[in-house]
């Protein structure tokens, strides 16, 4: 239980540090001036790697281009974030897009279908 609590705390600290670096230090043209939200960080049990899940608002560049830029900047982001966190080993960062809007769209479409069926059965 204590290990689980510690892992959650480290994940939250990593999330905050990475978000700060992306916001203030990264100058990549496909990253800066984009709405990038770090939805969650999942640290491996051995603390050597972390999966960083991001949500990228649609823009001129596709999500894939922004994700590729994040992956290319992962070393820099880790180096800058390690200045704020005191960890024995700073994990390797692996970025993944997490589409947080997809489940909402699915639920909304289901509700619309139910409303249409309701109109047909109860005019």
From Swiss-Prot:
Official protein name in the record: Ribosome-binding factor A
Subunit structure: Monomer. Binds 30S ribosomal subunits, but not 50S ribosomal subunits or 70S ribosomes.
Localization per Swiss-Prot or TrEMBL: Cytoplasm
Family: Belongs to the RbfA family.
Pfam family, one: RBFA
GO MF assignments: ribosomal small subunit binding
Subcellular location, principal: cytoplasm
InterPro entries: KH_dom-like_a/b, RbfA, RbfA_dom_sf
Coiled-coil boundaries: none
PANTHER family assigned to the protein according to its UniProt record, in alphabetical order: RIBOSOME-BINDING FACTOR A, CHLOROPLASTIC-RELATED (PTHR33515:SF1)
GO-annotated biological processes: maturation of SSU-rRNA; ribosome biogenesis
Role description: One of several proteins that assist in the late maturation steps of the functional core of the 30S ribosomal subunit. Associates with free 30S ribosomal subunits (but not with 30S subunits that are part of 70S ribosomes or polysomes). Required for efficient processing of 16S rRNA. May interact with the 5'-terminal helix region of 16S rRNA.
